UniProtKB/Swiss-Prot annotation:
Miscellaneous field: Present with 1590 molecules/cell in log phase SD medium.
Native species: Saccharomyces cerevisiae (strain ATCC 204508 / S288c)
Gene3D superfamilies referenced in this protein's UniProt entry, alphabetically: Zinc/RING finger domain, C3HC4 (zinc finger)
Region ranges (Disordered): 49-71, 138-425
Predominant localisation class: nucleus
Compositionally skewed regions (Acidic residues) per UniProt: 62-71, 179-195
Protein name: Histone deacetylase complex subunit CTI6
One Gene Ontology CC term in the entry: Rpd3L complex
Basic and acidic residues bias (residue ranges): 231-271, 312-342, 405-415
Length: 506
């Protein structure tokens, strides 16, 4: 508080007057300070009273809210207990009534902050009834939240898949040149592996050439990245064309081989002699390659021996091979004759067994002819093995057929009826009745046909005992027919009754 001095308006007379004026000013300041302190204390007291009043008011409101929260349970279903085991309730903001969360399609996980019942805010509810006649509701704000979350999840999944596809495409484009180079190298490796079977001594050279070519390819790929973008694109196109042409060439060679094999098979069916000659010519190269490799090994083993010894060894080594080839051809001829005698299968088997088998007229002293004969024998020996497999298959199929026949339901065994469930609709029952009526009509027709054959059974029979047995059988037929008639009558009455009722209801 600032003290204010009171200055007299009149003229100053003397020191006494000045002293009186100072005393008056000090007294006035004391009065002003006392009044200001009184006013401040009064203001503080009023503020405290107002704060106390404001604190008392929300307490009363809180008690009112507690009282309002204790509302009654008034659900759409009309029941007090929850229909599910969760026990989740939700309260209306306006009327404070409690409702089952299950009945309004709200769970504890997706419960909203504020909820209004169907009476206070009917536009937020979509009412419906279940199959059992129970009233239910769908709270629309919660449904909208679910839809939005589903849409977000779908969009996120779609964006992730799109990003993954783009990420896969980008490294493929960058590594395309390396893949093309590897494809060229792999195709060249296959061609060189086929050619390497000619001689064992050339394997090291082919491998070294392969490595050199691979290294040159890698150098070319590294140089490609160091060049300008235009040159790299051109080289990339050239690589693609080269790999495409190589693949086309490989595919063309495979197709040619398949066509040659098919033509040999057809020519074998028409002219077996020419087929054998072609097979000999076709296998000549591979046999010569194998023969050269074996002869090289024999020469390496017998380099230190004299010529006479080597000739004797060669003769002795060729004699058992000739004898083996003769024995194989004899065995093949015996098996072929046995196959012709025991051929009672299908037409394909007979055609294969009736094929002419040419005996070997002349056997040369070289290893190639013995190898050819052994290969022919192995090919011809495989035919009866196929027949044995077919006989096994036929035996297994006959066994399975016998098992199936034995597994059929017998007439003496009891059969359990298929009772309909309790919650079966009228349409389902009508369908069942029509199926039963159809079955009864078919069986009645079959039984009547069997009864008409009864006279043919007993026409030329004079033994009365046999006739009595036949009559007992057909008496059972009559009983079954009468039971079927009663059943059809009841089913027709049922169908007539309920079909009329359903038409009236519709």
């Amino acid at each position: 508080m600032e003290s204010t001095a009171i200055v007299p308006k009149g003229p100053v007379v003397g020191s006494e007057d000045m002293e009186k004026a100072e005393v008056i000013a000090s007294g006035s300041t004391d009065i002003i300070s006392t009044t200001s302190t009184a006013t401040t204390t009064a203001a503080i007291g009023s503020v405290q009273e107002e704060s106390v009043k404001q604190e008392d008011v929300p307490m009363e409101g809180g008690e009112g809210e507690v009282e309002e929260e204790e509302g009654e349970t008034r659900c759409i279903c009309g029941e007090l207990d929850t229909p599910d085991d969760s026990g989740f309730f939700i309260q209306c903001e306006q009327c404070s009534s409690w409702q089952h969360g299950y009945c309004v399609s709200i769970t504890q996980d997706n419960a909203p902050d504020k909820y209004w019942c169907e009476q206070c805010r009917p536009e937020l509810h979509q009412l419906f009834t279940t199959d059992t006649g129970e009233a239910r509701s769908i709270y629309k704000p919660v449904q909208e939240k679910r839809r939005q979350s589903r849409r977000k999840a779908r969009s996120a999944a779609a964006s992730k898949s799109h990003a993954a596809n783009e990420a896969e495409k980008s490294p493929r484009n960058t590594s395309n040149t390396d893949d093309n180079v590897d494809d060229i190298g792999d195709e060249e490796d296959e061609v060189e592996d086929e050619a390497s079977a000619v001689a064992l001594a050339k394997d090291g050279n082919t491998r070294s050439s392969r490595r050199r070519r691979r290294n040159s390819m890698d150098d070319a790929s590294t140089d490609q990245y160091s060049l300008d973008p235009g040159d790299s694109d051109k080289k990339l196109l050239d690589r693609k064309r080269a790999t495409f042409m190589a693949r086309e060439e490989k595919q063309y060679q495979r197709m040619l081989e398949k066509a040659l094999k098919e033509s040999r098979r057809t020519s074998h069916q028409e002219d077996p002699e020419s087929y054998e000659n072609d097979a000999d010519i076709y296998q000549g190269d591979t046999d010569n390659h194998n023969g050269t490799t074996r002869l090289q090994t024999d020469v390496m083993l017998t380099e230190g021996k004299p010529d006479s010894v080597t000739n004797d060894d060669m003769k002795e080594s060729l004699r058992p091979s000739k004898e083996q080839s003769m024995e194989k051809t004899n065995d093949v001829e015996k098996e072929a004759s046995q196959e012709k005698e025991s051929s009672t299968g299908s037409a394909q088997d007979t055609e294969k067994t009736d094929e002419p088998i040419l005996p070997l007229t002349s056997i040369s002293s070289s290893e190639d002819d013995s190898r050819k004969a052994s290969s022919r024998g192995s090919k011809r020996v495989s035919k009866p093995a196929r027949k044995g497999n077919r006989t096994r298959r036929s035996n297994t199929s006959s066994d399975t057929n016998q098992n199936r026949r034995s597994a059929d339901i017998g007439t003496d065994k009891p059969v359990k009826p298929r009772l309909p469930p309790q919650r079966t609709s009228l349409n389902e029952m009508r369908r069942r009745v029509s199926a039963i009526l159809e079955f009864i009509s078919r069986t009645q027709w079959e039984l009547s046909e069997d009864q008409s054959d009864r006279e043919e059974f007993v026409r030329f029979v004079e033994n009365q005992h046999f006739v009595e047995k036949v009559d007992t059988i057909y008496n059972g037929y009559n009983e079954s027919l009468s039971m079927m008639d009663d059943l059809t009558r009841e089913l027709l009455l049922w169908e007539k009754k309920y079909s009329n009722n359903t038409n009236a209801i519709q």
